[in-house]
Swiss-Prot record:
<dbReference type="InterPro" id="IPR007197">
    <property type="entry name" value="rSAM"/>
</dbReference>
<dbReference type="Pfam" id="PF01938">
    <property type="entry name" value="TRAM"/>
</dbReference>
<dbReference type="InterPro" id="IPR013848">
    <property type="entry name" value="Methylthiotransferase_N"/>
</dbReference>
<comment type="similarity">
    <text>Belongs to the methylthiotransferase family. MiaB subfamily.</text>
</comment>
<feature type="binding site">
    <location>
        <position position="51"/>
    </location>
    <ligand>
        <name>[4Fe-4S] cluster 1</name>
    </ligand>
</feature>
<dbReference type="InterPro" id="IPR005839">
    <property type="entry name" value="Methylthiotransferase"/>
</dbReference>
<feature type="binding site">
    <location>
        <position position="157"/>
    </location>
    <ligand>
        <name>[4Fe-4S] cluster 2</name>
    </ligand>
</feature>
<dbReference type="GO" id="GO:0005737">
    <property type="term" value="C:cytoplasm"/>
</dbReference>
<keyword id="KW-0949">S-adenosyl-L-methionine</keyword>
<feature type="domain" description="Radical SAM core">
    <location>
        <begin position="143"/>
        <end position="380"/>
    </location>
</feature>
<dbReference type="InterPro" id="IPR006463">
    <property type="entry name" value="MiaB_methiolase"/>
</dbReference>
<feature type="binding site">
    <location>
        <position position="85"/>
    </location>
    <ligand>
        <name>[4Fe-4S] cluster 1</name>
    </ligand>
</feature>
<feature type="binding site">
    <location>
        <position position="164"/>
    </location>
    <ligand>
        <name>[4Fe-4S] cluster 2</name>
    </ligand>
</feature>
<keyword id="KW-0963">Cytoplasm</keyword>
<feature type="binding site">
    <location>
        <position position="161"/>
    </location>
    <ligand>
        <name>[4Fe-4S] cluster 2</name>
    </ligand>
</feature>
<protein>
    <recommendedName>
        <fullName>tRNA-2-methylthio-N(6)-dimethylallyladenosine synthase</fullName>
        <ecNumber>2.8.4.3</ecNumber>
    </recommendedName>
</protein>
<feature type="domain" description="TRAM">
    <location>
        <begin position="383"/>
        <end position="446"/>
    </location>
</feature>
Amino acid sequence: MNKSPRRYHITTFGCQMNKADSERMAGILEDLGFQWSEDANEADLILYNTCTIRDNAEQKVYSYLGRQAKRKQTQPDLTLIVAGCVAQQEGEQLLRRVPEVDLIIGPQHANRLGDLLQQVFDGSQVVATEPIHIMEDITKPRRDSNITAWVNVIYGCNERCTYCVVPGVRGVEQSRTPAAIRAEMAQLGQQGYQEITLLGQNIDAYGRDLPGVTASGRHLHNFTDLLYYVHDVAGIERLRFATSHPRYFTERLIKACQELPKVCEHFHIPFQSGDNDILKAMKRGYTQEKYRQIIANIRDLMPDAAISADAIVGFPGETEAQFENTLKLVDEIGFDQLNTAAYSPRPGTPAAIWDDQLSEQVKSDRLQRLNHLVATKAAERSQRYLGRIEEILVEDVNPKDASQVMGRTRGNRLTFFTGDIEELRGKFVKVKITEVRPFSLTGVIF
């Protein structure tokens, strides 16, 4: 490849899927001879892997792009790439807004980055957003960690939630084969990785698009069976997965998590709203009663399991009483962590053009009230850790205190304790918890 920039920088916005995509694209760039630059302003190639789930994330991308577009006016050899969901959604329109961009690459094309770059270096301005079958991973990702790793098991989403752009920007569901997933995990185990998170926009949909059904009519491939299939991969000591959908979540999956010792006691199951009418308007496909039953089933079999979720406030037409149903659900379930957001109208989604939009003031007020309750309930949940001995996988140094290291419990609770990172990085350490906060813990080596 001619005229290759020597140094590259990737800025990633949004979800774990985007982070995994960025790692794959970084691996492609390094296979092509590029070297990582910590400072974007010193890089010859800059890639923004973008998120369009909310408007503020999208506007941040344009702010970053504007600065680098000005730089390109004096450094014409700078290569600007926009990847991810904004790239997919905006396409040619993004080029009209920021003509300095060289390559626009949607999520389904991430594995084609090398071929598309060749076209750029040959003098073309390239837009790759057409729906395609995703190429199997053929490049070793440049992982941000050598302890934990993400492994995609399914791309895309077939749901049609009325607020969500994901199906439009990430395409239909495409499952990787069990053999390909296990092979990637085996390679990670050989490289010394300890923990893997299996990823999917709707991980419970895994296998529905793969060929074959059982005699009873069940899909031959499903996520629960996949967990059993990959559980014994050598070297991998912990398994996590995200994200689950209440509509498809099964008791069989809970039982598998209970039986398989490597699977961590943590479930991320977004509920989005605690009101049935809002859930119906969102086209989520379940009721708050069904969601409560899922959590009850988990806690019956795994009483100490950590539960995290996502919630949206201020959905079009949401009344005060309907919002209070969300507060009631959060209060009664008690989440270990809850990712909250005020509703943000996204272009191309049905809810964005409804007449009953709420004011920003109302949405902000409800978000603040929900966040206050979330912190209160998380603090209550943290109390169960006080005095306990927890197994912590040490990942890094505490960025706020160099004398401490940090890692996570099996329940995904961030934990800090005094220790030497050079000695402890990548090791499992028994820690006695001496201090608890809503979303983190402090302890001492036991």
